[in-house]
């Protein structure tokens, strides 16, 4: 039997100075850019890792970690297999939520909104920036499908390596590309002492402008 774990002992205290409204940028994308830059330059591993939550048409949720591969005023971009579970869910229910947690900085960002595919040109540009092995992997894996053994992937990789051996530039697989989460709400969370954290939520208005509110922790 596994040793019993006392969950009440799994606790840490937050010690940051917190956030003030006057310090927050009126544009949440600019505020995110500041926080993301801090996370990257702090040397945090996988500073662009984020949890992506999707749901089926009937509302059954699922979540997984993906990598943020770009952001601008249009939204937040990640790439994947369109035929994967998340791809099928996004096709049926094109809304998603993202959560990024930088534990050493005691910061979290939550993003929610509708989802759209990136252009084929954007997908090609990113695909061709990837290492060749990763490009081959996109051709090899039928993501989320059941397979009998690892050797099936290894055999498929050998097959694709041979198939594309004479091609310096690999084609973009038709089933692979990017998604953009177009934000409707973005929340910035900063840990504080006594669990009285600072939370600021930006909500996009109909005219495209952002409204910012402080939320209770």
Segments the model singles out, each with a brief description of its role:
Residues 1-217:
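Binding-site signature for planar aromatic cofactors or substrates
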